[in-house]
Amino acid sequence: MQLTDKIFKGLYRRGVMLEQMKEPALSRTVKQMEPAEPCENPRDIDALSPEEILRAAEEADIVDETDGRPLAEKLREAMGSGTMLLIDAIDDEPYVSSQMGPMLALRDQCAGGIRLAARALGTTDATVLVYRHISDSEVAIPRNIGGIPIKRVGGKYPAQCQMEEELAERYSGKGSWLLCGACAMIHLYRAAVEGRPQTTTFVTVAGNCVGFPRNVEAPLGTPVLELLKLCGLTERPTRVILGGPLTGTATEDLRNEKVELSTTAVLAIRDDKHEYSYTCIGCGRCTAVCPQGLNPMRILQELRRGNRRAAEELGIEDCTQCTCCSYICPSRQSVAGEILLYRQKMKGGEEP
């Protein structure tokens, strides 16, 4: 299946163009907190059958970081369908490079995992996707890894979810494409060739308080504080975020907060100025940037009035929590955060 380049260019997508600030973490080597012992008897990658590949992914408990689903389950559903395999190394949020960094640093393992996944699917059609708009990158993005082509995804943030929606709309036939994470491919190679289970995850440790930003391969359950100690703090952060700066969550309990499979980044940030929120001025910027075409402030106003039905009619369930509305708001209102709180109340059976 050939995908049109218009899907990847993203010329007409809504959203916000963000300064990526991925350096210097992206160009540095991936730090392993607990280096693995070398495998004495690696299996021949070319001799593995599709069923053996799936069994290895199953026994290693590999979870795809793109959607949190077991990799074996995703591959088995599309097995033998000739599906085009798309590898997610997009990382379109600032600071975060926990997919692109390992893909580049461990490219032989990543390429090996992609070939294994493609064999399980019964396809030779595979492509790695990276974000186009990384102006500060100090590392050259190659045209391919191990012969597998790399395509650049353009467009404003959130480029990835908008690309997925366009793919789903244009190529709606079952088995036409499958999106898997670059890190899941690394773990698939290790599981199938070396017999290693997934006990680690890749995390970007960065922010303006981090002395040595880099991507770290951390054991699951590692306290967040240990990651910050490893990379060093130059000053006391005013907030620590787990995940990207737009979609992540703030934490204060650094000793008891543990690294999970869903932890893409630990960002230590110091804000030197206090932000105050003001009354909505009705500028309409939140509506202009919303990738779903919603009117976020109007939805929030209806929720504040307790008008659940009006909020539903305005499309509250279509909100993807990309937080573009909060980012662009000149009044500094936490539009996306408030909408999320109301949605959680509504799911719990409470009225807004």
Language-model region placement:
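Ferredoxin-type iron-sulfur electron-transfer modules in oxidoreductases and energy-metabolism complexes
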Residues: 264-277, 287, 291-352
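Active-site gating/interface segments in enzymes
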Residues: 158, 167-168, 233-281
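Iron-sulfur-cluster electron-transfer modules
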Residues: 1-125, 132-133, 144-148, 157, ...
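Short glycine/threonine-rich loop-to-helix capping motif typified by GTGT followed
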Residues: 135-143, 250-258, 330
